[in-house]
Amino acid sequence: VSKNVMPSIVSITGKFETTSQSWFGQTQSSESEGVGSGIIIGKKDGKILIVTNNHVVADAKSLSVGFVDGKSASATIRGTDSDADLAVVEVDTKNMKSSTLKKIAEITLGDSSKLQTGERAIAIGNALGYGQSVTGGYISALNRQVQLTDKTMTLIQTDAAINPGNSGGALLNSKGELIGINTVKYSSEDVEGMGYAIPINTAKPIINKLIKNEATSESEQAYLGVSGQTIDSSMASQFDMPSGVYVQQVIKSSPAQKAG
């Protein structure tokens, strides 16, 4: 199954510029690189269309997509939906070698409404940025309400390993059909093996609108543009600092930066 699907899976590398502020108010800019995965869902107007997570590509200065043959090409964002954590990026076929075009393939979509717990599941993606990897497991639960930083999402839960870099990759059934888009892994000292994916039936109408460059929601999710660390009472005591949230980074051009 995985061998047949590999031509549909890509790696996505983004370059990001962030600004951070020291305790003394000094602002510094730095460039970082992030990696994720994507799934080839079609071709339109000479462009290869790829779905991934919004958090993989949001605010990227530039994007590069790596294909199954190891070749890569620059990509641009076609549309994003931060509420659904989905994005469609495109690669101009003019920037791709003919040999690569012959080796890639469009993924086959499944029907996530027919899933049952205990069913086999396969996760494919660019785990840890090391290239394509395959992990197997089962559908652990359906319609899980998962609380993320700024939203609640209804997701598929699986014990197939979803590691950093797998975001935007494929969750497949035993037929090799796309049933979900890997998005997050729950990790703690007490819990292992809890990965989550956006059901493909939830994603399809949103993806179609993104391809057409149509608005996907009436209003965007409120967005501040900072990353921080929660300082709980034990950390506050250890480091002799107040409890609360310590702002570590302010994203360039975000509402937080514009507000000063």
Please describe what each predicted stretch is.
Residues 1-235, 242-243, 252:
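Serine-dependent protease modules
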Residues 50, 256-260:
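Conserved PDZ fold ligand-binding element
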Residues 239-241, 260:
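A structural signal for short secondary-structure junctions
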